[in-house]
């Protein structure tokens, strides 16, 4: 209660979470987090995955990324001119700011940093995403997917999250 910096960070996280909720549809990070429950809490899994799905969703959520990006910029987590960026470049800038905040908080920014993480977690997430009962969750994402596109698009997102290499993420054309 007496740590003003921590209180400010919590407020910032709350704002960012609120903006994430305002994005229509389902977030892939939320869907993926259920396959990580043996190594990360639900919230931790979502927070870790958000930067990677941000890059994938970027062309469809540019207005929201500019709003969130201004918050990151205000607090020194990004230097880029948000108005000069669009699409994937905007998504990468915001994703890097998300990861910078995570690193400042000593929060893992890659799956490989989670004790117990293995390729089996990625495999489990890909299998789970193809479950017919989750079809509407895939279709409701800002960039809709279906079971036939999970490996092609979600697979690289998860590989990027394992390594921190945003260049692995493929955007739909």
Model-derived regions: residue spans:
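C-terminal charged capping/lid subdomain of soluble metabolic enzymes
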Residues: 76-173
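Active-site segments that bind and position negatively charged phosphate/pyrophosphate groups
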Residues: 1-97
């Amino acid at each position: 209660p007496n740590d003003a910096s921590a209180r400010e960070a919590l407020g910032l996280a709350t704002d960012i979470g609120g903006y994430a909720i305002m994005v229509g549809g389902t977030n892939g990070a939320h869907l993926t987090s259920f396959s990580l429950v043996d190594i990360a809490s639900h919230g931790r899994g979502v927070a870790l995955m958000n930067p990677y799905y941000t890059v994938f969703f970027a062309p469809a959520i540019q207005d929201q990324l500019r709003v969130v990006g201004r918050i990151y910029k205000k607090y020194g987590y990004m230097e880029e001119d948000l108005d000069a960026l669009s699409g994937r470049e905007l998504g990468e800038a915001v994703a890097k700011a998300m990861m910078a905040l995570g690193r400042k908080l000593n929060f893992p920014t890659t799956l490989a940093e989670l004790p117990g993480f293995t390729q089996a977690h990625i495999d489990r997430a890909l299998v789970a995403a193809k479950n017919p009962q989750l079809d509407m969750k895939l279709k409701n994402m800002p960039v809709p997917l279906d079971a036939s596109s999970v490996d092609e698009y979600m697979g690289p997102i998860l590989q990027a999250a394992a390594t921190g290499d945003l260049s692995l993420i493929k955007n739909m054309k």
